[in-house]
Amino acid sequence: MALQIAQNNRDGQQLVGADQGKVEVYVLFANTTYRTLDLYWVCERERENMYLTLKPFEEVRVNTFTTHSWLFRDYYTGERMHVRSQRIFQPIRVRVPKSQQSPDQLVDVRSEVLIHFPMRSLRENCLWLVARWLIRTSNAPRRIIHGYHIPSTLKQQLLSLLTCIESYSRVAGTRRRR
């Protein structure tokens, strides 16, 4: 992505209504996965605030603050996606010289933030695959898991993933309806 001067560039003037000490940051979130993602921002109170849902390979321009952390979850399972191999993205202000003739004058630019799939072990990949398949194809996935002839540790991990996916579906569903 070529450098893009931020549209809301106010030449360093404070954003109207912004708290003192907050620095505005301009980002372009790009979903590089084949999954639909929920974007959340988190401020001082550590509460996840649903921002929007991003389809596969979709982008969105966001004006945020350095004090807002961002996280990204799979729309259906709640699995966390990553930015630069990290689960949480902390915005950083990017400024460049306005021109070569006046290198002292800096302007804000919008930085591209690539959201990607997390690195997982083969075991984790298989567990997620089985859990997602069971939720899509079965009315009683827990009963099926208990019937599998696999080690109890794998059963517990599958049950834990099912619980995680189901609880995320409930919580995210109420956030999306607001």
Swiss-Prot record:
Keyword Zinc attributed: no
Organism domain of life: Eukaryota
CDD domains, alphabetized: pVHL
GO biological process, one term: mitotic spindle assembly
Pathway membership: Protein modification; protein ubiquitination
GO CC terms in record: nucleus; VCB complex
Gene3D superfamilies: von Hippel-Lindau disease tumour suppressor, beta domain (2.60.40.780)
Keyword entries, A-Z: Angiogenesis, Developmental protein, Differentiation, Ubl conjugation pathway
UniProt xrefs under Pfam families: VHL
Presence of keyword Metal-binding: no
Sequence similarity: Belongs to the VHL family.
Stated role: Involved in development of tracheal vasculature. Probably involved in halting cell migration at the end of vascular tube outgrowth. Possesses E3 ubiquitin ligase activity when in complex with Elongin BC complex, Cul2 and Rox1a/Rbx1, and can target sima/Hif1a for ubiquitination. May play a critical role in promoting microtubule stabilization when tubulins are correctly folded by the prefoldin complex. If tubulin is incorrectly folded, may promote its degradation.
Subunit (UniProt): Part of a complex with Cul2, Roc1a/Rbx1 and the elongin BC complex. Interacts with sima/Hif1a. Interacts with itself. Interacts with mgr and betaTub56D/tubulin beta-1 chain. Interacts with tubulin alpha-beta heterodimers by itself or in complex with mgr. Interacts with microtubules (MTs).
Listed name of the protein: Protein Vhl
Species per Swiss-Prot/TrEMBL record: Drosophila melanogaster
